[in-house]
């Protein structure tokens, strides 16, 4: 029930800030608040969370909207899509494939037909700063706006490391709750801020591979689980 605790704490924090005269609150949501659908997801698309995590994120935003009306504090809600980069939990897709290949182990994945929107974590941080410095309120998507299949993503990692044969597409089944397509329409972000991503997908993956090479070389026996809350 940690998600419910985070919901309560977040709303208490926002209410306290509003009572102290805070004029704007920027919160972190998730793309999983949306109802999955083919094509690009814009901020006005239907919501339909299918997990407690996503439901509490959406609930937090809806409650913040009402708090905004009551206390006069503007609310900006960032919906993050798929992120990758240094310090990510090794059990997640990009680092798990990279680490398996660096250890000369098979990287077992699904058939990889899922369409995703991946953004390097440094570009995410820059987007947060850009939105914070803008006048945007309401929901803002934080994503690359560039769809890629999981198959192409992991194949690119294999190509970078020259270990394509270790990638085993179709070795894992699809998750029943996994959306097959999720990609951001990030036009609200790009048209209303100065944000321009520094990394394209290949550049970001190469940067991430280099980080993991250094990390595994300096921590050869350590199981990395990322930063707290990652």
Walk through the language-model features, giving the residues of each:
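Active-site Tyr-X1-5-Lys
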Residues: 37, 48-76, 102
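Flexible, glycine-rich beta-alpha linker
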Residues: 34, 51, 76-93
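Conserved Rossmann-fold NAD(P)-dependent oxidoreductase catalytic core, especially the SDR/UDP-sugar
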Residues: 11-52
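NAD(P)H-binding glycine-rich loop region in Rossmannoid oxidoreductase-like domains
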Residues: 1-5
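Conserved sequence/active-site signature of Rossmann-fold short-chain dehydrogenase/reductase
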Residues: 31-33, 83-85, 114, 124
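C-terminal substrate-binding subdomain of Rossmann-fold SDR/epimerase-dehydratase oxidoreductases
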Residues: 101-230
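Conserved active-site helix of classical SDR/Rossmann-fold NAD(P)-dependent CH-OH oxidoreductases
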Residues: 10-11, 15, 54, 58-65, ...
